[in-house]
Every structure is written in structure tokens, then in C-alpha cells.
């Protein structure tokens, strides 16, 4: 297997928190019910955890885009909702894909790491293919 894409994203948690629950925001339909439930179950701010998940979605998109260097981008409009960050019972993240992006990346393993420190959330995604 080899690395075919790397993506990273940083999110300002205070800025994100202001936007995430505003009526008409794109974020209302960006997160799956599971992502919203997981974030609300945490002891700290839900916005903090959703910001890290947003960063993960963006990192996956950047890694995928980078893997298509010199090729036309193929990004479905509702791509963020098709990238879901799930966690196991110990809080370790994994990416679950649905829709068109799942078809494009069917043979790709996605490694993801999320973090938040102070006012910043971040994520790194690495795409690995056979």
C-alpha cells in the first residue's frame, strides 16, 4: 500500500461556534445525526467536537483532491455530509463514507487524527491505496 493523499485543516473553535447553530447555515445539514449525538454526549462544548469533525471532513477532501493532482476535481455538492466521523468506545476516530465519495474511494484506506487545543481544532487525513 502507498500514500496517495494527505490533507490537514485547522478550525477556529470560537468562530465555528458562532456559525454552527445559526439558522440557514450550511452546518445544519453537514453533520450526521450520529456526529451531533456524539458531540452532545461529550463533557465539553459540542461546538469544540463538531469543529474537530469539520476539520476532519475538510482534511479528507483536501487529501482526496491532492490525490487527483492534474485531474479535474470531482466533488459532489453535499460531500461533507457523505464524510462521517465515527468513534469507537475509546474515542478513536474513523471515517465512514457514503454516497459518491464512497464509490470514488472504495479501495482507499483513510487514516484520520483529530485534536483540539485552546481555541483551535485540527485534523489530518492520510489516504492509502493498494
Curated annotation (Swiss-Prot):
Misc. remarks from the entry: Was identified as a high-confidence drug target.
Family per record: Belongs to the P-Pant transferase superfamily. AcpS family.
Enzyme Commission number(s): 2.7.8.7
Statement: the UniProt record of this protein carries the keyword DNA-binding: no
Binding site for Mg(2+) 2: 116
Residues that coordinate or bind CoA: 53, 115-116
Name of the protein in question: Holo-[acyl-carrier-protein] synthase
Cited SUPFAM superfamilies: 4'-phosphopantetheinyl transferase
Description of its domains: Apo-AcpS adopts different conformations depending upon the pH conditions of the crystallization solution.
Taxonomy, superkingdom: Bacteria
Higher taxonomy: Bacteria, Bacillati, Actinomycetota, Actinomycetes, Mycobacteriales
An annotated GO BP: fatty acid biosynthetic process
UniProt cross-references to Pfam families, sorted A to Z: ACPS
